């Protein structure tokens, strides 16, 4: 279900809103664990409302938004606090929701030059993220991450995308993307500092049959980890310091890379 409305105050300025409501059922991969997943309907409501402004040199929208997703299925391996070799799987079904604010603008101050700007603030949180198990010796173990920030999702996103058409067939461009602090595990005990990811390049349409391009990835040569830390999902803040200096597996920022490409059209 989708609905949208726009109200024009003037030829250039107005208000806009839209709402989308999607539903689905769990997919086949949710049945892979031994535990039966929650087969309740998954709902994804998305609502946005804000303003827009357009003229010859700028196109701008600024929107407040709300989005949620219910009945996400997951399985956690909980460890017996009295025996770290005693591990039991626990199924859970949880929700995610966030409110946010996004401003998107395309500026064309002079012929051939475009500048795209995007700013997003969001605060995605877990809801009903609770589960637990009882081990054979009677010991219980559980997790409650309700209210925690969703892993790997930054609160602040910024995109800066300038481009310039030297001729109608030759274009240079760059892209700067900022991701604020992201949490690396469910209990928000570990986090990665904010980072920039940078790209740049040149595109040349030689003729109707041949296009050439060159791209530089991470031209500021940023380094570091990102994403999540495998095996650290259930470490809490009180015990996080115990892992200082320990080797952990995760993912990393893509290193400095230069790429060339050619496209031939017959």
Residue ranges and their predicted role:
Residues 31-34, 82-84, 234-242:
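Short glycine/proline- and charge-enriched loop/turn segments
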Residues 200-202:
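Short, basic/aromatic-rich helical patch in the C-terminal catalytic core of site-specific tyrosine
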């Amino acid at each position: 279900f989708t609905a949208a409305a726009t109200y024009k105050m003037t030829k250039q300025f107005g208000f806009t809103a839209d709402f989308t409501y999607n539903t689905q059922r769990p997919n086949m991969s949710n049945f892979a664990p031994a535990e039966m997943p929650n087969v309740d309907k998954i709902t994804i409501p998305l609502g946005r409302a804000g303003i827009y402004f357009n003229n010859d040199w700028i196109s701008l929208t600024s929107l407040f938004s709300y989005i949620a997703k219910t009945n996400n299925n997951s399985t956690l391996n909980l460890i017996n606090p009295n025996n770290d070799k005693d591990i039991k799987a626990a199924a859970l079904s949880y929700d995610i929701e966030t409110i946010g604010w996004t401003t998107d603008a395309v500026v064309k101050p002079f012929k051939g030059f475009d500048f795209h700007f995007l700013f997003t603030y969001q605060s995605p949180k877990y809801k009903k993220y609770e589960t637990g198990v009882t081990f054979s010796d009677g010991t219980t173990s559980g997790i409650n991450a309700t209210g925690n920030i969703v892993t790997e999702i930054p609160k602040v996103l910024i995109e800066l995308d300038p481009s310039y058409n030297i001729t109608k067939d030759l274009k240079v461009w760059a892209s700067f993307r900022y991701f604020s602090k992201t949490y690396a595990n469910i209990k928000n005990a570990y986090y990665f500092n904010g980072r920039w990811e940078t790209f740049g390049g040149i595109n040349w349409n030689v003729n109707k049959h041949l296009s050439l391009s060159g791209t530089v990835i991470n031209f500021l040569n940023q380094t570091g980890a990102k994403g999540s830390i495998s095996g650290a999902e259930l470490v809490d803040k009180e015990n996080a310091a115990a892992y200082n200096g320990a080797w952990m597996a995760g993912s990393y920022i893509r290193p400095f890379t230069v790429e060339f490409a050619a496209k031939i059209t017959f």
